[in-house]
Amino acid sequence: VTPETLDHVALWVADRDPIADFVTSRVGMHVVDRTDAFTLVGSDARRGKLTLFEAEGPRERGALKHVALRVSKLDSALGSLDGTQVDRPRDGEAYMDVSEGLRLGLVEAPTEVEYDLDHVALWSRTPEETAEEYLGLGFSPASPGPSGAPRVEVGGAFVEFHQGEPGDPERPLLNHLAVLVESAEEHIAEARDRGLEIDNIVDAANTYAVFVWGPERVKVEYVEHKPTFSLT
């Protein structure tokens, strides 16, 4: 399995509009696509995005600690957050609670695209072991980040594993993590060969994807953009 980038983080939320309104008015994203089922937001359709799926509430944070976006100048980005309660645990980082348990971060680092995905932080009972298991899903090894938590890398973005209880909520906030691949068909064949637990295969208008259950019941999507993919 050879993912290219961290394509999106998908969430289940009871009301997607407050989150979509916040990220489009405060953190440089726009609505890439909206259907009856979901709203897709990002600063660039071909970079890291958030997918907000409508689902029955209330949702529980479960495995998801936070999602962090990358900016080249944090102070400038914070200027758009006037009136928002912001936590600054370390230099170059800021975190805020948005809605329905979603905690969003901003991390200062060199970036080709402002507000691209920097990292996703997950709770894990065994962070070191979980990071090791993600290598088998195509993620690359990486040194710990500023938080000191074990992490893996894909296309310059990271997944961090923080010591904590992910639980097994009936209505989790996190739907799945999605990585972009060249061929979903190859990943389907490899998943079957390796005995990975496939949750679903979806052949949609612009994408073709396979969903696999990862460690601690976090779902990973391997998604291929079809030639018809023209979202902006």
For every predicted segment, state its role.
Residues 1-4, 10-49, 76, 122-159:
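Core segments of cupin and vicinal oxygen chelate
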Residues 21-22, 27-44, 58, 65-96, ...:
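Acidic (E/D-rich), amphipathic helical modules within compact regulatory domains
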Residues 43-46, 55-56, 154-156, 165, ...:
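Secondary-structure transition/turn motif
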Residues 51, 160, 175-176, 221:
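Polar/charged side chains located within well-ordered beta-strands of beta-rich proteins
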Residues 5-14, 56-126, 143-146, 150-163, 188, ...:
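Vicinal oxygen chelate
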